[in-house]
Amino acid sequence: MTNNSTCIQPSVISTTALPVTYIFLFIIGLFGNSLAQWVFLTKIGKKTSTHIYLANLVTANLLVCTAMPFMGIYFLRGFYWKYQSVQCRLVNFLGTLSMHVSMFVSLLILSWIAISRYATLMKKESKQEATSCYERMFYGHVLKRFRQPNFARTMCIYIWGVVLVIIIPVTLYYSVVEATEEGQSQCYNRQMELGARPSQIAGLIGTTFIGFSFLVVVTSYYSLVSHLRRVRTCTSITEKDLTYRSVKRHLLIIQVLLVVCFLPYSIFKPIFYVLHQREGDCQQLNYLIEAKNILTCLASARSSTDPIIFLLLDKTFKKTLYGLLTKS
């Protein structure tokens, strides 16, 4: 096997561009998400299910923002650190844990928001257009729950609990066992970047989960468009069309987020696991590792840009924030 010190050689992209990007994302993400959380918790009186989902999404964003300085320092100095050093262990564990917990919590909440927005559309239609017993039960009881604040709070608690129970053991195993199996000396090493088979299997399961979340959003969006076309063929434009357009815009925003930020990462992950197994091709290995790290950074960038998305997703948040800015 090619020696780690000669095979794994980070380029200027890893040692300069990624640290600068992570620090920049940390600054704007911390400010924007802190402001958003302050608005959600203190300035919005009657909270809807959407507000609860978004507040938990902000919490996940703040979690990944706290990991960004660790990730930036890792790429800047990791090649020079000894693996057994305190800073290496700390950066590795906290960075990996925060990044993955935030990613999966965000995906689940985005999926729940998509279902909640679709439930908003079907609220009035369930009584007017549902004819079968199945339709009345599904639209009147199942989807209705996604719009209830208490249900939203309960689901968010379950989301955080399940994700933490799954991610923490995997991260501990990766940080304590896998990254030291081959006796690497540097913190930035082959085993740290690739992981052993258990971590790769967990990564593939996570990729499948990302695909499922994307499928939920796409299905909600497709159902909305189909319903809107059916309504417009038999009715004139009414006030409800404004609701349709609003929900359609919300689902489209979530869909674009998943496509731009998460889909490249999830598509590349299986390819990465297959191609890196070729022994001796150090140049290709370095390219693969840097591509993986760039796409991971892209996935985490969503957390820093979410406050802008909130302005598009929630009118109450937009009015409250504009009111605060006007007063100041």
Swiss-Prot record:
Subcellular localization is given as:
Cell membrane
Name the CDD domains for this protein. Answer: 7tmA_GPR82
* Keyword DNA-binding recorded: no
UniProtKB keywords: Cell membrane, G-protein coupled receptor, Glycoprotein, Membrane, Receptor, Transducer, Transmembrane, Transmembrane helix
**Pfam families on file:** 7tm_1
Q: Which residues are glycosylated?
A: 3-4
Q: Which domain of life is it from?
A: Eukaryota
Q: Where are the transmembrane segments?
A: 12-32, 56-76, 93-115, 157-177, 198-218, 252-272
- Is Transmembrane helix set as a keyword in this record? yes
Q: Name one GO molecular function term.
A: G protein-coupled receptor activity
Cystine pairs: none
Topological domains on the Cytoplasmic side lie at 33-55, 116-156, 219-251
Record membrane topology: Multi-pass membrane protein
Main location per UniProt? membrane
Q: Mind naming one GO cellular-component term on file for this protein?
A: plasma membrane
| InterPro entries found in the cross-reference section | GPCR_Rhodpsn, GPCR_Rhodpsn_7TM, GPR82
GO biological process, alphabetically ordered = adipose tissue development; energy homeostasis; response to food; response to glucose; response to insulin; triglyceride metabolic process
Positions on the Extracellular side per record topology:
1-11, 77-92, 178-197, 273-328
Function in brief: Orphan receptor.
Q: What family does the entry list?
A: Belongs to the G-protein coupled receptor 1 family.
**Protein name listed in UniProt:** Probable G-protein coupled receptor 82
The root-end lineage is: Eukaryota, Metazoa, Chordata, Craniata, Vertebrata
